[in-house]
Design a protein with these regions (language model features):
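An alpha-helical support segment within catalytic cores of ATP-dependent transferases
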Residues: 5-25, 121-178, 188-189, 233-239, ...
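Active-site acidic catalytic loop and adjacent metal/ATP-binding pocket
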Residues: 30-45, 49-50, 163-209
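Active-site activation/catalytic loop segments of kinase-like enzymes and analogous catalytic loops
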Residues: 206-237, 247-266, 277-292, 296, ...
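ATP-binding pocket architecture of kinase catalytic cores
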Residues: 28-154
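Low-complexity intrinsically disordered segments
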Residues: 323-329
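Alpha-helical transmembrane segments of integral membrane proteins
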Residues: 71, 240-247
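Glycine-rich, phosphate-binding/catalytic loops in enzymes
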Residues: 66-67, 193, 210-213, 272
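A general structural signal marking secondary-structure boundaries and capping sites
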Residues: 76, 116-121, 166, 216, ...
Length: 330
């Protein structure tokens, strides 16, 4: 089951970590979009997670990612690591048995993100800022003409308005996970663990907050969610930043997913109705929807774009733009 190209390195890792060269039991773990191969293994009657970064994985900063993971593990946010080798692309960590999420999951996530964002030692992404990546992807989406103008021209115009006023201040960047979706959150019955730190780097705090909010925060719980994160009721400016980032990410994820699907040759039906936002995310949490399939990616793209389209036509969008713009200009 372990790829032949990794078998020697895995045997060496097992020997260094546990003094053995064989695994008692091994089972593949699936569900994410990462190119890494992940397994649950048993060594000396204890379960561990084995993660293998495969050749051809997207270029990044493996050493920086592992340093971030080590920092998170030492802080008790990521599971304990038993072995890590960036050159071989091998990680062995504690395997956390998942329990059902608690009723107050939104508050728990917010408090966990506050701990993540207080960490030190994370680096900026080597390929440029997150905002630059967003702009590049949205531009590629626009150039690809994957949807008719009457569905996306307004989105592009309002996205541009948003990005003109949204702060890009490096001094505000914090240690970020950048992929806080259910597949990367494991609740053990007492505490929440974040796994898969492949995308970890310094970023705007509202990225993590917005990603997790898609899954766990209903509109009427926004104030409680942000208060749990900040430790005090959020200011109107903080609410506005959070709200605008959510809209920017709706456009970004819609663009990313449709461009990815188009490059894979997946048909895109511009007239297909978008699934309900909350229902689709509930099905993602339960595992009913598998985002590794091209069809699900297209559906999820339409979910995000429909959400953005609804919000850019609301008074709150205009108010948030004005508030953030006025704060940026003193």
């Amino acid at each position: 089951m372990i790829p032949e190209s990794k078998q020697t390195a895995v045997s060496r890792a097992l020997d260094e970590a546990f003094g053995v060269r064989e695994i008692t039991d091994i089972r593949p773990l699936t569900g994410g979009l990462s190119t890494a191969q992940v397994f649950r293994i048993v060594v000396r009657n204890k379960r561990y997670l084995l993660r293998l970064t495969m050749p051809g994985a997207p270029a990044g900063d493996p050493a920086g990612q592992l340093a971030s993971l080590q920092t998170a593990a030492e802080a008790g946010i990521a599971p304990h690591m038993w072995y890590v080798n960036a050159e071989d692309g091998i990680l062995i960590a504690d395997f956390v048995e998942a329990r059902p999420y608690p009723a107050d999951m939104a508050v728990l996530v917010a408090q966990t993100l506050a701990r993540v964002h207080s960490l030190r030692g994370f680096q900026k992404p080597r390929v440029g800022s997150y905002f630059d990546a967003m702009d590049k992807l949205v531009s590629a989406f626009r150039a690809a003409n994957l949807l008719p103008p009457d569905q996306i021209d307004e989105l592009f115009r309002r996205y541009a308005d948003l990005m003109k006023v949204y702060p890009r201040n490096d001094a505000e960047l914090v240690a970020s996970h950048n992929d806080v979706k259910p597949q990367n959150m494991v609740f053990d019955g007492e505490r929440l663990w974040l796994v898969d730190w492949e995308a970890a780097f310094l970023n705007d705090r509202y990225v993590d907050l917005s990603i997790s909010a898609n899954f766990f925060v209903r509109d009427d719980r926004e104030a409680a969610y942000l208060a749990a994160y900040f430790g005090t009721p959020a200011t109107p400016y903080q609410h506005a930043r959070f709200y605008l980032m959510r809209q920017a990410l709706h456009v970004f994820y819609g663009a990313f997913l449709l461009v990815t699907a188009a490059r894979a040759g997946t048909p895109i039906d511009s007239m297909a109705p978008a699934p309900d936002f909350r229902d689709f995310h509930e099905r993602l949490i339960s595992g009913e929807v598998d985002l590794t399939t091209p069809e699900a990616k297209v559906q999820y793209a339409l979910v995000h774009l429909a959400a953005a389209r609804r919000q850019i036509r609301t008074p709150r969008f205009e108010e948030a733009l004005a508030l953030v713009a006025s704060s940026a200009h003193g």
